[in-house]
Amino acid sequence: MTEKNQDAVTEEQGTEVVLQIQRIYVKDVSFEAPNLPHIFQQEWKPKLDFNLSTETTHLAEDLYEVCLNISVETTMEGSEDVAFICEVKQAGIFAISGLEDVQLAHCLTSQCPNMLFPYARELISSLVNRGTFPALNLAPVNFDALFVEYMQRQQAQEESKTEEKEKKEVH
């Protein structure tokens, strides 16, 4: 196939989708163990509180920063004693083109965080290990399911706003 034919195929099929990692980095990290050393004298029965969020920033044309924010707070079951708090902001710069609207939102809130999560999980595991706590292996996160849930919430909010507006117009 000649170069002209390849360009024509790309134009016929639509815009070529590009997703490239430009850089992955740690934006912020914090590890606190406020109740050391007496926490080690207690029986290890942890209660884990895991929070996750993402932030996206449009840096330039087709260039985005995605930041995965993870907070893990572990308290001892049956008490208020905090064993440790670990917070990580794992970020990446991604070149993304050929996507618009919902597809771009899906890429930024699902595919990019999927690429960042293993780095954040390893960093958290390492920090917990350096605090000499038992191993912490965070389970994989289904970012696709989180995106679908988010879109359903957005749609429900839009529908309720429309219904409220219609009720006000009737009265």
Curated annotation (Swiss-Prot):
The entry's family comment says: Belongs to the SecB family.
Q: Name one GO molecular function term.
A: unfolded protein binding
Q: What is this protein called?
A: Protein-export protein SecB
What this chain does, per the entry, is described as: One of the proteins required for the normal export of preproteins out of the cell cytoplasm. It is a molecular chaperone that binds to a subset of precursor proteins, maintaining them in a translocation-competent state. It also specifically binds to its receptor SecA.
Q: Which Pfam families match?
A: SecB (PF02556)
Which of UniProt's keywords are assigned here? Chaperone, Cytoplasm, Protein transport, Translocation, Transport
Does Iron count among this protein's keywords? no
What is an annotated GO biological process for this record, any one?
protein folding
Lineage top rank: taxon:
Bacteria
Q: How does it assemble?
A: Homotetramer, a dimer of dimers. One homotetramer interacts with 1 SecA dimer.
**Where does it live in the cell?**
Cytoplasm
UniProt xrefs under InterPro entries: SecB, SecB-like_sf
- Cited SUPFAM superfamilies: SecB-like
**Organismal lineage:** Bacteria, Pseudomonadati, Pseudomonadota, Gammaproteobacteria, Pasteurellales
Q: Which GO terms describe its cellular component?
A: cytoplasm
- The main location is cytoplasm
